[in-house]
């Protein structure tokens, strides 16, 4: 599209400025793991953060919270990766966002949607959080069956993929692109029909992206029913990879990431959810739809989720069984749907106040990640005791202490106000609960990730649920805006 080829010098400079040193390279090793260019295995503890793919053209929730506040909270909960959906109109240089409370997000005032996308990606990158971009909808409204529609051509799709790849290829923590969200309906695989074969379109899309961003990963989803090489029925959009067994993808194996989607009864009640053997019937279904390829390809779920007990009662059972199955396949990562609470059929990690956390969902995800805590070890036999000399008593060590230092970072300033972030670090030798005071100018009118009060030129702040207690050496962060 011509609008992308006439991007202003300023926009290009902004894109290049996102890079913090040379870009990382991501690939798939022989053990089907994602690794960076140092050979370090990358585990994606991910969540979907949506909004840029909608008519708002910006991440949702900014009517209720500060955007950096949410990113800090994500990271504090243990997420280290996001899948970030977008739509073509968001990429246009003249598209403006909607539904932002600028009193909470003053640094976004006057920015286009693309400029905000740049800032959001740059913030994730600065925090060492991985980003998988996702071409989600062609019209910023509904999910299309194919990669093109009557008003959005394949040529436009390929141009958009190239544009995104070129813009973010040098941002170290952007690891790749999900070529098309949830092919379904008319989409086929391996039939020889060029108009509908998603596998061939994915190969063309991959070639377009890798020609521009050769260090990226390419995420490819499945389809739904297929006339060949597929047992059909009961498949969620993007969830059927069965035809891959008959028609492999001509995409470099060290760049290919299979990323099917799967959901439970909160999204749609498939017949197998009513089976008398549910949920014990599910592993065989998952194995058929996508799991059979976990032994030959890098595979994770690009979307999965649900209300987890606050909708259809079976959904919690389903999600628990899914995580158990994934762990059995050696899959300990993926992108949960969603961070946002305003996903009607799944809810989110956040509740409707855009702040409170579904701790039960986090417990589920930590089980998937393998960070839920150690299980009780199997007892070992008690050995026959042998006499030992009485040891010399050792002095009781002095308990550790916690002390806290602060670092104030200026985020934005303008005539009449400013926004700062404050990093609080436990410089002591034991964990502790932080409460600090920092000098301020003017009147604080908004703060996030802290309980706060102002007395004169002093801002007093203490942690909230997810960041209140810091281990020795750990850092929390909160922010505030003030009228000066």
Swiss-Prot record:
Signal peptide: 1-25
Location of the CBM2 domain: 395-484
Region (Disordered) residue spans: 370-402
InterPro entries (UniProt xref): CBD2 (IPR001919), CBM2/CBM3_carb-bd_dom_sf (IPR008965), CBM2_carb-bd_dom_sf (IPR012291), Glyco_hydro_5 (IPR001547), Glyco_hydro_5_CS (IPR018087), Glycoside_hydrolase_SF (IPR017853)
Catalysed reactions, as listed in the record: Endohydrolysis of (1->4)-beta-D-glucosidic linkages in cellulose, lichenin and cereal beta-D-glucans
Record flagged with keyword Repeat: yes
Domain of life where this protein originates: Bacteria
KW Metal-binding (keyword) present: no
Residue numbers annotated as active site: 182, 303
GO BP annotation list: cellulose catabolic process
Alphabetical UniProt keywords: Carbohydrate metabolism, Cellulose degradation, Glycosidase, Hydrolase, Polysaccharide degradation, Repeat, Signal
Biased composition (Pro residues): 378-398
Record-level Gene Ontology MF annotations: cellulase activity; polysaccharide binding
Region (Thr-Pro repeats ('hinge') (Pro-Thr box)): 375-399
Enzyme Commission code: 3.2.1.4
A family per Pfam: CBM_2
Entry-linked SUPFAM superfamilies: (Trans)glycosidases, Carbohydrate-binding domain
PANTHER family in alphabetical order: ENDOGLUCANASE (PTHR35923:SF2), MAJOR EXTRACELLULAR ENDOGLUCANASE (PTHR35923)
Family per similarity comment: Belongs to the glycosyl hydrolase 5 (cellulase A) family.
Entry note about domains: The C-terminal region of the protein is not crucial for activity. The Thr/Pro-rich region (also termed 'hinge') may be a potential site for proteolysis.
Protein name: Major extracellular endoglucanase
Recorded name of the encoding gene: engXCA
